[in-house]
Amino acid sequence: MNVKLVSYTRDGEKVVAIASKMSRSRKGWDYHEKTMTDEEIEVWIRDAILHGYWSVLEHSIYTFSIEGISRVASHQLVRHRVASYTQMSHRFAKPIDEYYKPITPPSIEKRAKEIIEKAYQEAYENYFKLLQDGVPEEDARYVLPNGVNTNIVVTMNARELYNFFALRLCSRAQWEIRAIAWKMLEEVKKVHPRLFRYVGPNCIIHENFIRNEPITLDEVLQKDNIEFISQRCIEGVMRDGILKCIRNSKHVLEYLK
């Protein structure tokens, strides 16, 4: 799996901060662009996110190239509908030779690797038999497994990314889409750390709505003295188990090593 941020709004943090401030100011864009300091950028981003004023996040756009994932994962991705997608077509880009690398889930890798490898190989052979019999590519691909590898270009704004991360960083998310989410988060934090400082699974998002001082995902991952106020997360995990649950979620990246 390879996840790469290929394009983004360069001044996204400042754009979001100015938009947030302009909603409460009589002055226009030019004034705020000239006068806004780095400290103000952080203040206005924090204010918007922690008060649920997420519409301003929509002004910053991010495009990712996500390669070497299964069709199972890509079908989950496109359920996030406030986004744009362009996926590799198995009609025009036939999955042959080195381009046929179906994804094997870790649970099967440990228990039934031979079974899935045999099924993948049989599907591959049947695909070619259909092509040789004159079946069109768009119909022959019906025998390909859900695990067949694919590439996809994904564009989301920062608000949709917050919603995406809230769902897909959660340990209850399926392992592959969860790994994609963690890798996407790594990419956006490289370029806009202030904008994505308060991102996290839903347990962190909802926790910060009721705290006087917000917590960050980095703090939860690195510090053992973090205590949650919420009695339980929206997935039903009790307060004492939330910290461990979040940390377990990121362990999915170890499958990819």
Swiss-Prot record:
Species this protein is from: Sulfurisphaera tokodaii (strain DSM 16993 / JCM 10545 / NBRC 100140 / 7) (Sulfolobus tokodaii)
Pfam families noted in UniProt: Thy1
EC number: 2.1.1.148
Sequence positions that bind FAD: 55, 79-81, 87, 157-159, 163
Active site: 168 (involved in ionization of n3 of dump, leading to its activation)
Cofactor requirement: FAD
Disulfide-linked positions: none
NCBIfam families named among the record's database cross-references: thyX
Pathway(s): Pyrimidine metabolism; dTTP biosynthesis
Annotated dUMP binding sites: 76-79, 87-91, 141, 168
Name under which the protein is recorded: Flavin-dependent thymidylate synthase
GO terms of molecular function: flavin adenine dinucleotide binding; NADPH binding; thymidylate synthase (FAD) activity; thymidylate synthase activity
Cofactor note: Binds 4 FAD per tetramer. Each FAD binding site is formed by three monomers.
UniProt GO BP: dTMP biosynthetic process; dTTP biosynthetic process; methylation
Gene transcribed to yield this protein: thyX
Family assignment from sequence similarity: Belongs to the thymidylate synthase ThyX family.
Keywords: FAD, Flavoprotein, Methyltransferase, NADP, Nucleotide biosynthesis, Transferase
Classification via InterPro entries: Thymidylate_synthase_ThyX, Thymidylate_synthase_ThyX_sf
Quaternary structure and interacting proteins, as annotated: Homotetramer.
Main function: Catalyzes the reductive methylation of 2'-deoxyuridine-5'-monophosphate (dUMP) to 2'-deoxythymidine-5'-monophosphate (dTMP) while utilizing 5,10-methylenetetrahydrofolate (mTHF) as the methyl donor, and NADPH and FADH(2) as the reductant.
Locus of motif ThyX motif: 79-89
Enzyme class: transferase
ThyX domain residues: 1-202
Methyltransferase found in the keyword field: yes
Catalysed reactions, semicolon-separated: dUMP + (6R)-5,10-methylene-5,6,7,8-tetrahydrofolate + NADPH + H(+) = dTMP + (6S)-5,6,7,8-tetrahydrofolate + NADP(+)
